Amino acid sequence: MYAVVAMKYRDDCVTLELDTGESILLPASDVTGLSIRVGSTISREGYDMMKEESRRFQCKRAAFDYLAIRPRTVSEMERYLTRKGFDVDMIRGTVEDLARSGYLNDEDYAARYIGARLRKKLVGRNLLAAELQRRGVSRHVISHALKVAGAQTAAIDEVYGLALKKYNSLGPAKNRVSKIASFLRGRGFDFDTITAVVERLRSEQGCEEDE
């Protein structure tokens, strides 16, 4: 048997201090429902159940703290909770609960990420896809999000304007066309888009590869 020797309340949780010197963190609602107070005794079975519930509560709290910084993908959350030392089953249950409640949604995350990224800077689908893949979003979800956002194909006029600005900034430097192509690849534009822009530069600016 275990005896509760002290109870410390903070926000939505209670820390039970036992006569063994151990502390158990629980949701305040659980403690109220179990009618636990200082002097209460807890059986071994009850202790094990409380330990499990405490771990589950701490896992969910850690998840919400992580989400408070910014939205996360399912994969990011799983990796974070793993680093925090929670076991696989605990993480799976927590992630499933968060997904059911709408706190984790890779489709919504991808759509918002793409929209925010494009508002900040003109980039291509390859870069967007690579960034989302690093965050653990599946290829299927990424492809759908790019399509919905209209980012599957870049607007040639916009990319050309970006390339022309870069081209002019290079001044009389050699191999400006190659540098432009490399610049556009770094921005994540696909081969067809880069080819079209480079050809337009050659046509409208009269530039050659060996200049």
What are these language model-derived features?
Residues 1-211:
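An alpha-helical, amphipathic repeat domain used for nucleic-acid recognition
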